Amino acid sequence: EDEYEGGVWWEELLYVETETTCIDSVAPLITTKWGQCYPWNNGFPVDNGETCPTGCVAVAMAQLLNYLHGAIGKPSGLYHDAYISGYRNGSNYHLDISLSNYVDNSPRWLQMPVDMYDQNIAFARNLMIDVGYRFEIEYTADGSGADVSTSKIANYGISCTKGEYDYSTLLSNLQAGLPVLVTAYRTENKVLGITVGFSNGHCWILDGWRRERTRQRAYTRLHRIEITLDDYDWLREDSESYYLPEDIYTWYPDAYDGAIECSGDSYSDSVYWMMNWGYDGVYDNVKYGTYSGAPWKTSSDRNYKYKRRFYYGFN
């Protein structure tokens, strides 16, 4: 059998060089990192000897109100004196909230703490007590919760729209400097296969967006293999594995056995949401998918994927 002049070539992948950069973004609008437990809940109701958390609604709304005061001038004032006490013992539940000394255009807005290590924790705590009163939060040791509605938000003189997921709408709000309030659940309750409700809910803020571009550059080593004329025809059918001489010299004019070649650059873009989860900044640096139904997790078993609702267009 005669040898096929020129042989055939194949490429060995050595490695892929990857570089990702952010090419456009809305930086997280909410800079505070508040939470539900100590020191934020100091003095809150006690459930069987355990201090109740302030509640995710209280944290999300308080951070949102703190931001909106600077962004749209609403709300203007704060109650400088806020008091909460109460207890839960079995079926016995008592709650007492007192708000007084309302100060219009309060200077405390500019003195709010950034995180749990900052000063003036009491200012943020008082605002969470205010939210607890207006949203009728029910306090328990396992979690303090309340329903969110546009009418409750309107108690602060702020109007907004409630809707389901729409990428363009949410992004346009962020680009206008307006965060989005989110509510969702991680458990779907079913009876005989029929959904009867949802549980394990959470309220948080969607406040940032990123567009990232990834460049990939592959490096390969060329190998030349001698073949016979009888092999030539079937090798033409296996072009995904082998290059014929006329092909290899088109791609790599100076090809030689053992040459290291670069395939050139390929680019792909990805977009992500950024969240403020109300857990003292934990999980806030995680990037979340923007497609409908994307996993929004704070841990492997805490995916808030059910009944997502969005409050936006604050004015």
Regions found by a protein language model. Give the residues of each.
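Active-site-proximal structural scaffolding
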Residues: G49, T54-A58, G145-A146, Q175, ...
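Short loop/turn segments at secondary-structure transitions that flank enzyme active sites
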Residues: A62, Y67, A71, E188, ...
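Noncatalytic regulatory segments and standalone regulatory/sensor domains
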Residues: E1-T21, H223-C262, S266, V271-N315
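Structural recognition of the beta-strand scaffold that forms the well-ordered cores
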Residues: G55-N66, N126-Y133, S149-K152, C160-G163, ...
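Active-site-adjacent substructure of cysteine-protease-like catalytic cores
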Residues: S159-D269
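Extended interaction regions within the primary functional domain
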Residues: I153-A154, S172, V180-T183, D301-R309, ...
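Active-site-adjacent structural segments surrounding the nucleophilic cysteine of cysteine proteases
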Residues: E1-D142
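Extracellular hydrolytic enzyme modules, especially secreted metalloproteases
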Residues: F135-S151, Y156-G157, G278-D284
